[in-house]
């Protein structure tokens, strides 16, 4: 593909230059996949329309390794009751990888969204074997539900 800009009108000069290329430059046919970023609607926007009632459906993928109920046991992964708002890598009874132990902050909606999208990209070296939950709405529904899985549920 080639983009060109032509001079179509010049009030001071008239002649045979109309329609001639004034400046041209090549444009790549496509952008390679490694330079193209996918836009993801911010989790705060998606949470506004999220349906927490659909969270358990998405959480079913997680229950092999995690318990969501109050008093749930540590399995291959930490129990997730009361996890929202707590420090990352701080759930009792679970030995976290250095990948998560080295991350400062709390499990916010933004942190959960990034981790659940691509755990190994968000926390390189994590022990979590799950590839990620790619659907943006599914992640929002799951996170909205996770906010409710607590002794004192946090506001979205």
What would you call each of these model-derived segments?
Residues 1-38, 154-156:
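N-terminal export/targeting leaders of redox proteins
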Residues 1-6, 10, 106-156:
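C-terminal capping alpha-helices of c-type cytochrome domains
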Residues 25-59:
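Electrostatic cytochrome c docking/interface patches
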Residues 55, 59-69, 142-146:
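The canonical Cys-X-X-Cys-His
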Residues 43-49, 63-67, 95-96:
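N-terminal post-signal-peptidase region of extra-cytosolic proteins
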Residues 56, 70-109, 129-132:
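Gly/Gly-Pro-rich "capping" loops immediately C-terminal to redox-active cysteine motifs
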